[in-house]
């Protein structure tokens, strides 16, 4: 039995939840495969790690050098000794340093062939005699000249005492070698390159010398060469910056390197204030994308200018000696690079975003297959749909993320184990909520799964690649503005990448040097705080925008309505039972039956209540101009009243406006003008309530392939607020009425149904819950004659307390089911009446068909003219002729007598006399209407 109390929010949510739960059970293995994707990806990462360990981490080049000191009798090494003395420069980094050696603080000077010089550059470069240039500027030129003179020592200090480092500290020593990542061993000392002693002027006794380097276990002599230093004054810092820039290969047209050793801006330095800016070459830090940064030899530059200023204040001989640099002791180490931390940001960006295409295609699939709208037409509101769908996506995403963290930790990925799990989970939770909101938001822009899938995967892989090769490069670049980093993080893919980058950095540092991973105490020191704020704000903004665009797209409202001087939610111009707005446009001349229908509607509009289920008053639909085409008037002022218990059939050629009318009545589009009411409810104001009392059988079957027929009816029955035994009884009766109950057919998946069975199920869905109004679009399409008759019987039985509007191309179906018919042509209702009335009104003739030998065709024409002078030939081919004979001119008995008499004169192969059919009426009305439209 019907329960016309609308289903509440939680009843609708419960219906959808049960349906989705059943649907997901049938697709359990798809969900399992989705959830275990992180496991396979983590295993892949472990495999890459094993290969990396074999080729890189455990390579002899990445551990302290060793030498065999004792061999066994079989020639195999019995004892190894490892230490600095057996190591190359690369291997030395991994050796134990219980007592790291003190090292000379060296100044970085350009190579001879790249030094900037005011002299004959080509000549001095060929001989290697170009001086080392130091640039200075400042506000006080005289003070600058003094400090410039004090920068380089004019004396040379060197003796063979044990305090050789202190003695060397009096000299300005430099190297062309770049520094390393640590100060355990300096490449400038260990390499074969000489050390340069920068002097204002080189003399024969200071040109070349050597000193012993005795720092256990290393002992060797190091050559020191004198190089001339040249201090040059510039007017301001802009000149220095331009000169340094032009010294880079890309900074000049000749692509020649002109490098200076150091540059100083003394600014407002005076006797009471020491304020200096130092230029240095930051490119020596190495690749900005490398997680380890090399030292740059800035300390010696600072010491030089500081000593020069001290001499200015205190006189010559006053110095702060920079004796040496020395690292802290360390044990022997090995290379411990973890791939999960190295490639973690891009890899896990892809892993987490893999859920996005799944969610987006799921939403677009329901829209493409019209499943969303058919659920809405049967009473499912937007709120319950959003809540249940969002909850499902969130649940599957949480399980996915938890599995990722569990699998990653179980197989030992330090990316997960070294960072606080609570921080990780909250970050992932926020990211997946933002991801779900964006999926809802962008789903409105797609109507096909293929397009949505391609766009989603472009977003997934594009975010990872752009994050790794663009965003990370800019993030680690010191010159890129931080404000632009914040702006880039507004892109969800980059905010996800930034969070994963922070996790990988903390895990990498802990793995490399034993520092702690990311903890809550580090939260404010990292970028995670700003990332959390960005994601939270974007989550709510995207969710609101998604709900807005969904409402706009589903109601056909212009998304920029708020920029116009009109209300998009403007209701119908005339409420049912109240005052009716009079159209300013004159109504064209109409047929009497159509005019009578319009008058009846006008009277109904003045009444407070009627027994009519559907009332349409001057309903119009005009499609706006598009792509240069004029506007299209699909429905032209339709007035129609359908009482309860009546089946109204709509006939018409393609493009007549039937579909546009049905779409307006079912809420798929808004009327341009006019009003329509379903049991007193305005389709513009109260469509959500209207949906609770209507049923729809669309032209194409909208079913879930894995749900059974019974499960379909249970779902839609719950949406009609049927519960308990009433629901079970209604489902059983519906299955029996469409012959889907016996033989276990009701419990088979709909995907295994034949086309006719699916059609019958669609009709049963539209009728369950005894809706007040049912719209059926060609309900018996594709059915065999027996099934068609059975279905018609079910529909006829259901219309006792239901108003049905039915569209069909089958005249037999229209005559059997419909109490009244309306023929639609060019958006207008051309005639209204029951089938017998229409045939009597528009079919006032008989059709005589006669087949004879071709030579007797003239005899047949003469025969017909004798019977009816106004008869018209409507068909003629190969001896077969058809004539339309007006009924008022002839009696059937006269035709029979004339034919029997004619048989005596010529041979008649076959003949027949038929009354006008409904199809003849339809064709006649359609042709007449189209002809009048052409000449109007």
Curated annotation (Swiss-Prot):
Key words of the record: ATP-binding, Membrane, Nucleotide-binding, Transmembrane, Transmembrane helix, Transport
Annotated organism of origin: Arabidopsis thaliana
Transmembrane domains' residue ranges: 34-54, 340-360, 393-413, 422-442, 454-474, 484-501, 527-547
Protein name: ABC transporter A family member 5
Domain ABC transporter, residue spans: 614-851
Gene Ontology molecular function terms on file: ABC-type transporter activity; ATP binding; ATP hydrolysis activity
Binding positions (ATP): 652-659
Protein's membrane topology: Multi-pass membrane protein
UniProt GO cellular component terms: membrane
Intracellular or extracellular location(s): Membrane
InterPro entries documented for this protein: AAA+_ATPase, ABC2_TM, ABC_transporter-like_ATP-bd, ABC_transporter-like_CS, ABCA, P-loop_NTPase
Organism superkingdom: Eukaryota
One family name in Pfam for this protein: ABC2_membrane_3
Family affiliation: Belongs to the ABC transporter superfamily. ABCA family. CPR flippase (TC 3.A.1.211) subfamily.
